[in-house]
Amino acid sequence: CNAQQVGNAAIKAPAMPENPPENWLTYHLAHPGPGTATPGDPNPAFFWKGRYHLHYIYKERVPRRKRKGPDLGPDWAHVSSEDMVHWTWHPTVLGPKTMGHGMFSGTGFFTKEGKPGIIYHGKGSNRNWISYALDDSMDQWSKPELVLPKDQEGKPITDMPYFDPDLWIDNGIYYAVNARSSSQAPVLMKSDNLKDWDYMGELLHPDFDEAKLGVAKDEDISCPNMFKLGDKWVLLCISHRLGCRYFIGDFQDEQFLPEQHGMMNWAAWDFFAPESLLTSDGRRVMWSWCTTITPKRFQPVPRKKKLGALKIQTGVQSLPRELSLSEDGVLLIKPLRELEQLRTDEKREENLTVKGDTTHVLQGVT
């Protein structure tokens, strides 16, 4: 890869205020503030050199009168942790000042040689890009390289919309999916070397069974994150209409054939933009963006409201959760094991049977 560093224009690391407001959430991973940023989608997540790293979209709110030049888009904030519970902010190095374009959604991956990299959509470029970590703290990155697939005749495809890319390796081949607009299907590319990409067509298999899955094939698939879980493939994604959801199925003949579809949102679509990683002991752990909602209508706070004047957060990262499959292939979701260290003053009752239409009072629990 191009070893030119892009981290030399970094701004200082964000920091929590010494005395945060009473309504400021500090239990979840929340961007420091208040009133300084609009944090959003979680993005590249890694376990690397003994630490977990997570990036997320971070758009600093600058009053219009203080803006200098055009708005080139958001940065990616960067945090790391030894346990995915207690986080440290790093300097913000991935953004317009260093990459030449804003950082929209993407994902992290490891090359076949074990080197960490990122693939993402560069705001304003209508293209996806790849960059590689140059140091163990992930504070220095290579100059971004263009991802431009070719058709069967070897001609570059320049008129295709690209956004929200995800990348994985299967049988020694790199595959990358590009999300597209709500009226278009996600498309697949493949490469042997991360430089030369072939366009493969639609990701979803033509045998996609809408009746069985309970969802239309053309339902928006954005923020995809695809990985193997047990002997099945899982596609986490969102619909801008439905919120966070998932498919379970098989990746066969270089297409994805789902067998199950499930929702991760119910009353509201405030659980958004999933991202996951593998832990050091092989667990699949995911995050999502918890968008701000109004209690009355369960809808995101309208952007036209005076967000700059709000003294509350406009989004936090969900608590991390572990994903696994049951023996009969059902997706199981449970809180991250490491969160147990936050528990105090445990009360326990065991071998308890509660019959229907009865009340059992737990002693010492309020």
Which residues make up each language-model segment?
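Catalytic and ligand-binding motifs that coordinate phosphates/metal ions
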Residues: 268-278
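Secretory/extracellular carbohydrate-interaction modules
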Residues: 354-366
